[in-house]
């Protein structure tokens, strides 16, 4: 199929504006890039936040979208390890590839990073996109485009958080706050896969039902009262070994920290910036409590390339299930964003391109 000159895309014309459909040129390849024909792209809070928080997007207009499944249709002149026809997803941090952090599996801390796919460069809300070849990860046969599209963030992110930060092991009691969202619902599955006993907290009936279906052992309706008190009751006063907070509001962070058992780990993985959601994320930590109970507080920032590949393999084996509750055509992106802003989506949404 010959390369077209133009493509359909959803663009963010300026800061704070709604997305709008547009016909734009197909992006040009750099020598180390690949051109993807986009098959599906995930819709998550990261994309919604970039439209409302100043400084995330480097220039306008911008094509959003950082979760992608696509087919390689063209290679840059220096690309050798990827083939035309490969199905791939991508690591969405743009990095130098040579600094201490990039070479030690901590790409997300690269000091030379210009930003993220869909913010510092155009993303996957389009029929075609370019991406540095070093960012792509092969999609195994048997994993659908929609599942693969969300895997690189919504599933891989909690894989890293549960394994490396929370260090969930057999018998651990694990609290997951914001468990019914696009990342939290997969954290429930990851914690169960690691042998944890999962207490899943959220604020709507449909999300609590969904996390039960995803394997949660105990449900906590945060509307019914103090989070830490509910955890204490469910654990007979023991507390949890790990708390993973995908909301990161003042209330949930205080509740998560207050829910920890001795030697417990609090993992902060999500955020809902005030500019986008009106959420206050500041909270006070008493160092005497942290010291006396030997607590740990971790920030968990995305994943490595290897962890994306491992997550895709878990999907291929059927050990993890991708939870995509709604799919939309490309032009339905703004509708999907509005559902996210209203906290009305269970699990993830995806845009599917024909």
Which residue stretches match the model-derived regions?
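Mid-domain Rossmann-like dinucleotide-binding core that forms the NAD(H)/NADP(H) cofactor-binding site
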Residues: 141-225, 229
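Glycine-rich phosphate-binding loop and adjacent beta-alpha segment
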Residues: 194, 203, 250-321, 352-354
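NAD(P)H dinucleotide-binding glycine-rich loop of Rossmann-like/cofactor-binding domains
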Residues: 37, 94-178
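C-terminal hydrophobic helical "lid"/dimerization subdomain
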Residues: 1-7, 262, 304-354
């Amino acid at each position: 199929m010959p390369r077209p000159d133009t493509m359909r895309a959803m663009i963010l014309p300026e800061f704070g504006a709604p997305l709008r459909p547009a016909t734009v040129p197909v992006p040009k390849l750099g020598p180390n890039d690949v051109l993807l024909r986009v098959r599906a792209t995930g819709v998550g809070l990261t994309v919604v936040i970039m439209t409302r928080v100043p400084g995330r997007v480097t220039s306008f207009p911008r094509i959003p979208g950082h979760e992608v499944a696509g087919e390689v249709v063209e290679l840059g002149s220096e690309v050798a390890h990827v083939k035309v026809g490969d199905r791939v997803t991508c690591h969405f941090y743009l990095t130098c590839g040579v600094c201490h952090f990039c070479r030690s599996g901590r790409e997300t801390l690269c000091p030379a990073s210009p930003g993220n796919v869909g913010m510092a460069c155009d993303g996957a809300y389009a029929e075609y996109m370019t991406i540095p070849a070093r960012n792509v990860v092969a999609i195994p046969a048997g994993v659908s485009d929609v599942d693969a599209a969300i895997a690189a963030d919504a599933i891989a992110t909690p894989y890293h958080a549960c394994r490396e930060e929370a260090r969930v092991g057999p018998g651990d009691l694990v609290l997951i706050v914001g468990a019914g969202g696009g990342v939290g619902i997969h954290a429930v599955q990851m914690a169960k896969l690691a042998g944890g006993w999962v207490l899943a907290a959220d604020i709507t009936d449909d999300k609590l039902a969904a996390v039960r279906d995803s394997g949660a052992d105990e449900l906590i309706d945060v509307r019914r009262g103090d989070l830490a008190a509910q955890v204490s009751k469910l654990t007979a006063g023991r507390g949890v070994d790990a708390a993973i907070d995908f909301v990161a509001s003042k209330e949930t962070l205080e509740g998560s920290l207050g829910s920890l058992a001795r030697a417990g780990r609090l993992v902060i993985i999500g955020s809902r910036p005030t500019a986008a959601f009106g959420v206050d994320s500041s909270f006070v930590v008493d160092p005497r409590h942290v010291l006396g109970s030997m607590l740990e507080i971790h920030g968990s920032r995305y994943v490595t390339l290897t962890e994306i590949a491992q997550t895709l393999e878990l999907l291929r084996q059927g050990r993890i299930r991708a939870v995509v509750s709604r799919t939309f055509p490309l032009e339905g992106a703004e509708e999907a964003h509005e559902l996210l802003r209203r906290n009305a989506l269970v699990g993830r949404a995806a845009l599917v391109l024909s």
